[in-house]
C-alpha cells in the first residue's frame, strides 16, 4: 500500500494492550481533502484533520479496513490543531470512506467523536459519459431545466457535479433507450447558471468512477418577473395588478382631497356672493344711513 504519512503508527497496539479507545469524549474534528475528494489515478491527495480542540494526536480511519487506521502528531497553530495525511499516489484500493479522530496525551484511550465521513473517489477509470441539457444550455430565468447523463456503457449509477459545490447528486441509470443508459437530473426552475460534469460508476465499485464528461455550461438569462408571469403579474390581457394597485391608491387619495377642495370653493363663492349683494343695496338706504349718522353726530355735539 502506498499510503504515506510524515509519521504514522498502526493503532492496533491498543488491541495488544487489551483495550480499545473510548470514542466521543471530545468534539468531532473536521476532515477535508486537498485539492478535492475526486482524485485521478496516481495523483496526490492530502487529507487534513483539524479542530479548535488542542489534540495531541490525530487518527485517520478508512471504513472496513482496520489496518488502515493511521496516527499522526498534531500541529498547533493560531488556536487550531491539525494533521495532514498524504496519499502520494492514488490507487483503486485507497479509495473509500474516511473519518478522523483526535486524542490528547494524558488520555490516549479516549478519542473524540468521529469527523463527518469523507468519500475519496478515484476517477478516470472508464469511458466518459455524455451530458446534455433540456430544453438547452441557455434558458430563461424560472424555466425548468433537466440535465441528462448518458453512455453506451452499462453504468449502474450516474453522478452529477457542479463547480464550486462539495457534494454530487446521484441517480441510478434508467433502462436502455436507443442503445444508451441514462439518468435525468431535474434541476427545477433555473435561477443561477453553472458548469456541470457527470460520471458513471458500477454497483460493485462505488468509489471508482469513469472519466468526467465534457463540461456543460448552463446559462440563465432574463429576469424571472419578466419571463414568467406569476399570480401577481399576469399577462397584458388581464391587466397588471401592480398598476391597478397604484391607480386605486391614487384614487383613494384624490377623493377626499376633491371633496375638501369643493367645500372650500363653495364657501369662497358664497362669501363673494354675499359681498356682491351688499355692494348692490339701494342708494336711498345708503343716504338714510348717512343722514342718520349725521343726525347722531349733531346730537352728540349739542350735548357737549
UniProtKB/Swiss-Prot annotation:
<feature type="topological domain" description="Extracellular">
    <location>
        <begin position="22"/>
        <end position="245"/>
    </location>
</feature>
<feature type="topological domain" description="Cytoplasmic">
    <location>
        <begin position="265"/>
        <end position="304"/>
    </location>
</feature>
<keyword id="KW-0675">Receptor</keyword>
<feature type="glycosylation site" description="N-linked (GlcNAc...) asparagine">
    <location>
        <position position="67"/>
    </location>
</feature>
<dbReference type="InterPro" id="IPR013151">
    <property type="entry name" value="Immunoglobulin_dom"/>
</dbReference>
<dbReference type="Pfam" id="PF00047">
    <property type="entry name" value="ig"/>
</dbReference>
<feature type="region of interest" description="Disordered">
    <location>
        <begin position="280"/>
        <end position="304"/>
    </location>
</feature>
<dbReference type="InterPro" id="IPR013783">
    <property type="entry name" value="Ig-like_fold"/>
</dbReference>
<dbReference type="GO" id="GO:0002764">
    <property type="term" value="P:immune response-regulating signaling pathway"/>
</dbReference>
<dbReference type="InterPro" id="IPR050412">
    <property type="entry name" value="Ig-like_Receptors_ImmuneReg"/>
</dbReference>
<comment type="subunit">
    <text>Interacts with the adapter protein TYROBP/DAP12; the interaction enhances KIR2DS1 stability at the cell surface.</text>
</comment>
<feature type="domain" description="Ig-like C2-type 1">
    <location>
        <begin position="42"/>
        <end position="107"/>
    </location>
</feature>
<comment type="function">
    <text>Receptor on natural killer (NK) cells for some HLA-C alleles such as w6. Does not inhibit the activity of NK cells.</text>
</comment>
<feature type="transmembrane region" description="Helical">
    <location>
        <begin position="246"/>
        <end position="264"/>
    </location>
</feature>
<dbReference type="GO" id="GO:0016020">
    <property type="term" value="C:membrane"/>
</dbReference>
<keyword id="KW-1003">Cell membrane</keyword>
<dbReference type="InterPro" id="IPR036179">
    <property type="entry name" value="Ig-like_dom_sf"/>
</dbReference>
<dbReference type="InterPro" id="IPR003599">
    <property type="entry name" value="Ig_sub"/>
</dbReference>
<keyword id="KW-1015">Disulfide bond</keyword>
<dbReference type="GO" id="GO:0006955">
    <property type="term" value="P:immune response"/>
</dbReference>
<feature type="glycosylation site" description="N-linked (GlcNAc...) asparagine">
    <location>
        <position position="144"/>
    </location>
</feature>
<feature type="compositionally biased region" description="Low complexity">
    <location>
        <begin position="223"/>
        <end position="239"/>
    </location>
</feature>
<keyword id="KW-0472">Membrane</keyword>
<keyword id="KW-0393">Immunoglobulin domain</keyword>
<protein>
    <recommendedName>
        <fullName>Killer cell immunoglobulin-like receptor 2DS1</fullName>
    </recommendedName>
</protein>
<feature type="disulfide bond">
    <location>
        <begin position="149"/>
        <end position="198"/>
    </location>
</feature>
<feature type="glycosylation site" description="N-linked (GlcNAc...) asparagine">
    <location>
        <position position="84"/>
    </location>
</feature>
<feature type="disulfide bond">
    <location>
        <begin position="49"/>
        <end position="100"/>
    </location>
</feature>
<keyword id="KW-1133">Transmembrane helix</keyword>
<feature type="domain" description="Ig-like C2-type 2">
    <location>
        <begin position="142"/>
        <end position="205"/>
    </location>
</feature>
<feature type="region of interest" description="Disordered">
    <location>
        <begin position="220"/>
        <end position="239"/>
    </location>
</feature>
<dbReference type="GO" id="GO:0005886">
    <property type="term" value="C:plasma membrane"/>
</dbReference>
<keyword id="KW-0677">Repeat</keyword>
<keyword id="KW-0812">Transmembrane</keyword>
<keyword id="KW-0325">Glycoprotein</keyword>
<feature type="glycosylation site" description="N-linked (GlcNAc...) asparagine">
    <location>
        <position position="178"/>
    </location>
</feature>
<dbReference type="GO" id="GO:0004888">
    <property type="term" value="F:transmembrane signaling receptor activity"/>
</dbReference>
<comment type="similarity">
    <text>Belongs to the immunoglobulin superfamily.</text>
</comment>
<keyword id="KW-0732">Signal</keyword>
<feature type="signal peptide">
    <location>
        <begin position="1"/>
        <end position="21"/>
    </location>
</feature>
Amino acid at each position: 500500500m502506498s499510503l504515506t504519512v510524515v509519521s504514522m503508527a498502526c493503532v492496533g497496539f491498543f488491541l495488544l494492550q487489551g483495550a480499545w479507545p473510548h470514542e466521543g469524549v471530545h468534539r468531532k474534528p473536521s476532515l477535508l481533502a486537498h485539492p478535492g475528494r475526486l482524485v485521478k489515478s496516481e495523483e496526490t491527495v492530502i487529507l487534513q484533520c483539524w479542530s479548535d480542540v488542542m489534540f495531541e494526536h490525530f487518527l485517520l480511519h478508512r471504513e472496513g479496513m482496520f489496518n488502515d487506521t493511521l496516527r499522526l502528531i498534531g500541529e498547533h497553530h493560531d488556536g487550531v490543531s491539525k494533521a495532514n495525511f498524504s496519499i502520494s499516489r492514488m490507487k483503486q484500493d485507497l479509495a473509500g470512506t474516511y473519518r478522523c479522530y483526535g486524542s490528547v496525551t494524558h488520555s490516549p484511550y479516549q478519542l473524540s467523536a468521529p469527523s463527518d465521513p469523507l468519500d475519496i473517489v478515484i476517477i478516470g477509470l472508464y469511458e466518459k459519459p455524455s451530458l446534455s441539457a433540456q430544453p438547452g444550455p441557455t434558458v430563461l430565468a424560472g424555466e425548468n431545466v433537466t440535465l441528462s447523463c448518458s453512455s453506451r456503457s452499462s453504468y449502474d449509477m450516474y453522478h452529477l457535479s457542479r463547480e464550486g459545490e462539495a457534494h454530487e447528486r446521484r441517480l441510478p441509470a434508467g433502462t436502455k433507450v436507443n442503445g444508451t443508459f441514462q439518468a435525468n437530473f431535474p434541476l427545477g426552475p433555473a435561477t443561477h447558471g453553472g458548469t456541470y460534469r457527470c460520471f458513471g460508476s458500477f454497483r460493485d465499485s462505488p468509489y471508482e468512477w469513469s472519466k468526467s464528461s465534457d463540461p456543460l455550461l448552463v446559462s440563465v438569462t432574463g429576469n424571472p418577473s419578466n419571463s414568467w408571469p406569476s399570480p401577481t403579474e399576469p399577462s397584458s390581457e388581464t391587466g397588471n395588478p401592480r398598476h391597478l394597485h397604484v391607480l386605486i391608491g391614487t384614487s383613494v387619495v384624490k377623493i377626499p382631497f376633491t371633496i375638501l377642495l369643493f367645500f372650500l370653493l363653495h364657501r369662497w363663492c358664497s362669501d363673494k356672493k354675499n359681498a356682491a349683494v351688499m355692494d348692490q343695496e339701494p342708494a336711498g338706504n345708503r343716504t338714510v344711513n348717512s343722514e342718520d349718522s349725521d343726525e347722531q353726530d349733531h346730537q352728540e355735539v349739542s350735548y357737549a
